[in-house]
């Protein structure tokens, strides 16, 4: 995400030229409209700062985020929340509506968390990215990746040790045997390399 800062001036110009040619925003992730489906949403704190490092703040962020999508009747299929970013799998018919929900959510969350931390005006969020999930295999590999994310980033040794993840609901709803079967059938491998490392 922050590779742009490490690029030479010529490399930066080439990236901007390519994004312009593809019709993408010059310095932001593109958000595609009009495609119904499940999406992986990734939102990172500005410069990956651990704004939500305290457990009560992380619990509050999870509740605020999941409830915002429940209220909008957008199914949240999986999630993980970490101190400096989160991932969701959501189903939507209109990416424009989902983008607006995230924009309003991030504004509200930033105002509240900055008030709690006595840091008015601090930039909390960078932007969010979305990726259309293209197949059942992609869906389950993404869900497994989300559930493994806290282990990958070194917060815990086991997925079930991280309370801010939908792994607990998956275990309750599907049972341990089914979750383990999905883990074996849809391995994470190097999923996330280049954008969540």
Kindly give the residue locations of the regions a language model identified.
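Short catalytic/metal-binding and nucleic-acid-binding patches
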Residues: 1-197
């Amino acid at each position: 995400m922050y590779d742009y800062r490490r690029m030479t001036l010529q490399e930066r110009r080439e990236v901007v030229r390519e994004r312009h040619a593809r019709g993408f925003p010059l310095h932001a992730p593109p958000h595609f409209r009009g495609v119904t489906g499940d999406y992986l949403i990734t939102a990172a704190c500005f410069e990956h700062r651990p704004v939500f490092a305290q457990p009560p703040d992380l619990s509050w962020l999870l509740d605020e985020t999941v409830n915002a999508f429940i209220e909008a009747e957008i199914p949240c299929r999986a999630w993980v929340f970490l101190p400096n970013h989160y991932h969701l799998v959501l189903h939507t018919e209109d990416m424009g509506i989902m983008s607006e929900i995230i924009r309003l959510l991030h504004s509200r969350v930033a105002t509240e968390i900055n008030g709690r931390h006595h840091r008015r005006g601090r930039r909390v969020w960078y932007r969010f990215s979305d990726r259309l999930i293209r197949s059942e295999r992609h869906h389950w590999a993404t869900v497994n990746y989300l559930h493994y994310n806290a282990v990958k980033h070194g917060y815990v040794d086991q997925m079930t040790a991280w309370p801010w993840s939908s792994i607990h609901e998956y275990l309750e709803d599907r049972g341990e045997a089914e979750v383990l079967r999905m883990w074996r059938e849809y391995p994470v491998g190097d999923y996330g390399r280049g954008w969540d490392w």
